[in-house]
Amino acid sequence: LRKDNADGVYTEASLRAGNLQNELRNVVIAGDELVGYDIDTFYYGAHVGIGKVIPRGNEGDSIDVYGKFIYTHYDDEDFTVDGGKFHLDSIESERLRLGFRINEVQNNKLNMYYGAAWEYEFGGDSNNSVVGYDIDVNAPSLEGSTVIGEIGAHYKASDKWSIDLNGRAYVGQREGFSGSVQANYSF
């Protein structure tokens, strides 16, 4: 949900829920046997944000400066590996993201963008146990700062069809990269 104002300021919010599937096969060694697990975890979340789109250069080109608060909850999960019972605690994630995105219109069908953001995770801790006993596994924590760089494109194939490509790199508390390809049909 997004509301754009004439001065370029916008507010946005979203709700989401789903199921996260995690499968690990033939990795955990139990005696002479390779075993694994398969778990499904319910999650839900929300975000609120505010930003300002500032026109620049050619018509349609802009800089989007924004701030977002993102909340996500992952349910706890119990599973068994080779007779051993494991419990993963629920996780609460609260993040603040401040960033910018530069949008450039290439032609009437193609828009490119790139940007950067700083994100701070306020928590994201997880505790685990085996057969009812707390275990010290240096419980993972995502608390801390991450810098995110992104690049992407939006191609409008027709009035109804469009394709989005996106790539992101993460440095700091979270490290790695992600990408997505999305086809959109508008009614």
Question: For the regions a protein language model found, what residue spans apply to each?
Answer:
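Membrane translocator/pore-forming domains, dominated by Gram-negative outer-membrane beta-barrels
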Residues: 1-187
